[in-house]
């Protein structure tokens, strides 16, 4: 019977939906090593040194081969919103997996033209970008509130897993004969797209989308299966009516346009999501993940493939900690502390690299290089448990269902835009100012901590509907961690006012309870129709 599938459902959802993150990570983790392989450079490099018999890529070509996947991803995450609204997240995920697979095939079969690989990277990026919006969104809409943060963190866990495995594959293939060096490294990514596409076929559409398109009975069935309860049970019916009421209320103003996500009721969260996702890239994480091979070479490391693999292993291992950190300490504090920690690590990394790495005779200082690797590992230790997963959690859970697809698309587009800018311009900047580049990232990390302190509210343990009420209230972000919004009591107040003839849109008293006080202060906010 259907209700017996509940426990397995969450596990299956975690694995197959999060595989979309693996696809993203595999591309990120492979490109740096692939573009450094001998056969790849012999075919696609635009520079040759006859004295050393070494081929190399110019900064422009290196930046294009590395960064164009992000251009495709930017486009993919924008078009994912209207497609998901039309076909649902489940079918959209399947479709964009197919797009990703086509892009990988074109890369593997590339003729001796670097332009074909660049174009294929754009096509692959369309799939990756769309899935970076759809996968966390599907998880947020389907997972129970008590584990929603953990569920969404699994997406980032699989991103880091993909990066690490790609580094391991590069380590094993870079000595193979001729084109096998890079074709195997790229081609194995087909497997991740196929696994994701097949796995999602066995998962249901999210109940929120089903209610949105009028398939209420199917939504109740999905709710009952995930909760391991009968469809007519009180818990399932209460959850269904809560979702139904929330969705009807939010869609009363008509279809959501792109302009409406910048309306006064939602623009605070729209800009917050854009800032958080932009700052996630500006932490400097992809400085190591895209160019870890080159960075390690510059630091005088003899085995850059091994060093890059070590960095990726630290990233993957520490992401498991993020699953605990976000559920135990919430969203705000880890992001604030993580930003400060990462800023310190980058400052030391850059100071050592720019002042102590090279002796006067031009040889590298191995001790200074070791310190830089330690600082890079400590940076990743903090990033993997804070900014890496928390940014996706905030974007996945902060928006009302009417605005969710478009707001998440705009926020994630900001992430991909900065991803491209960093990946493309890093070779130029690194060649110009060297390791002083890290001072820029140190400043951005500190800025990120300040932005979170001033603008992000604590949402740990709240339902998506309660989160909406929290952001509609007047609670200051730095005070939001002390309060647990009592959604059911607030609804009782609304119903009482409605019963007495109160018009919709009137001032509603939001009843909130402080977790550390006996009093029950009230906050007044204007709940207006979303137009």
Curated annotation (Swiss-Prot):
Gene3D superfamilies per the UniProt record, alphabetical: MFS general substrate transporter like domains
MF annotations from Gene Ontology: carbohydrate:proton symporter activity; galactose transmembrane transporter activity
Residues the record marks as carrying a glycan: 361
GO-annotated cellular components: plasma membrane
Principal location listed in the UniProt entry: membrane
GO biological process terms on file: carbohydrate transport; D-glucose import; galactose import across plasma membrane
Chain ranges on the Extracellular side, renumbered to this chain: 35-62, 113-116, 170-183, 290-305, 354-367, 430-436
TM stretches of this protein: 14-34, 63-83, 92-112, 117-137, 149-169, 184-204, 271-289, 306-326, 333-353, 368-388, 409-429, 437-457
Pfam name, any one: Sugar_tr
Alphabetical list of PROSITE patterns matching this protein: MFS (PS50850), SUGAR_TRANSPORT_1 (PS00216)
Family the UniProt entry places it in: Belongs to the major facilitator superfamily. Sugar transporter (TC 2.A.1.1) family.
Stated name of the protein: High-affinity glucose transporter ght2
Organism of origin: Schizosaccharomyces pombe (strain 972 / ATCC 24843)
């Amino acid at each position: 019977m259907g209700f017996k599938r509940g426990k397995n459902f969450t596990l299956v959802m975690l694995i197959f939906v999060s595989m979309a993150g693996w696809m993203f990570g595999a591309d990120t983790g492979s490109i740096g090593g692939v573009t450094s392989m001998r056969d790849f450079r012999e075919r696609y490099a635009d520079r040759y040194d006859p004295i050393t018999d070494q081929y190399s890529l110019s900064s422009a070509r290196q930046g294009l081969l590395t960064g164009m996947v992000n251009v495709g991803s930017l486009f993919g995450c924008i078009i994912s919103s209207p497609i998901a609204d039309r076909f649902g997240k489940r079918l959209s995920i399947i479709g964009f997996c197919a797009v990703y697979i086509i892009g990988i095939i074109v890369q593997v079969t590339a003729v001796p033209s670097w332009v074909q690989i660049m174009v294929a990277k754009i096509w692959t990026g369309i799939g990756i970008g769309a899935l970076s919006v759809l996968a966390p969104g599907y998880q947020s809409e389907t997972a129970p509130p008590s584990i929603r943060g953990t569920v969404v963190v699994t997406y980032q866990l699989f991103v880091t897993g993909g990066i690490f495995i790609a580094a391991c594959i590069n380590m094993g293939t870079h000595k193979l004969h001729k084109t096998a060096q890079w074709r195997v490294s790229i081609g194995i990514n087909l497997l991740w797209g196929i696994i994701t596409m097949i796995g999602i076929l066995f998962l249901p559409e999210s109940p929120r989308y089903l209610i949105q398109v009028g398939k209420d009975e199917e939504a109740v069935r999905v709710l009952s299966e995930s909760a391991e309860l009968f469809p007519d049970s009180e818990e399932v019916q209460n959850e269904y009516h809560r979702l139904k009421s929330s969705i009807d209320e939010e869609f009363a103003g008509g279809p959501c346009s792109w302009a409406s996500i910048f309306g006064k009721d939602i623009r605070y969260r729209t800009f917050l999501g854009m800032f958080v996702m932009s700052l996630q890239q500006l932490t400097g994480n992809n400085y190591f993940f895209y160019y870890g091979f080159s960075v390690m070479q510059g630091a005088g490391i003899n085995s850059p493939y091994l060093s890059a693999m070590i960095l990726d292993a630290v990233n993957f291992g520490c992401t498991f900690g993020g699953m605990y950190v976000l559920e135990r300490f919430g969203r705000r504090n880890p992001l604030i502390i993580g930003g400060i920690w990462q800023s310190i690590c980058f400052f030391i990394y850059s100071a050592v690299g720019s002042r102590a790495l090279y002796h006067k005779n031009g040889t590298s200082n191995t001790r200074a290089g070791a310190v830089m690797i330690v600082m890079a590992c400590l940076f990743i230790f903090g990033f993997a448990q804070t900014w890496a997963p928390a940014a996706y959690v905030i974007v996945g859970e902060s928006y009302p269902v009417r605005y969710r697809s478009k707001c998440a698309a705009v926020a994630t587009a900001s992430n991909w835009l900065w991803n491209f800018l960093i990946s493309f311009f890093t070779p130029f900047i690194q060649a110009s100012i060297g390791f002083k580049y890290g001072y820029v990232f140190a400043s951005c990390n500190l800025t990120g901590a300040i932005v979170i302190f001033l603008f992000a509210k604590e949402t740990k343990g709240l339902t998506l509907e309660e989160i909406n009420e929290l952001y509609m209230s007047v609670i200051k972000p730095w005070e939001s961690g002390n309060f647990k919004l009592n959604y059911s009591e607030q609804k009782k107040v609304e119903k009482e006012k409605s019963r007495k003839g109160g018009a919709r849109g009137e001032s509603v008293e939001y009843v909130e309870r402080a977790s550390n006080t006996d009093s029950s202060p009230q906050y007044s906010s204007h709940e207006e129709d979303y137009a």
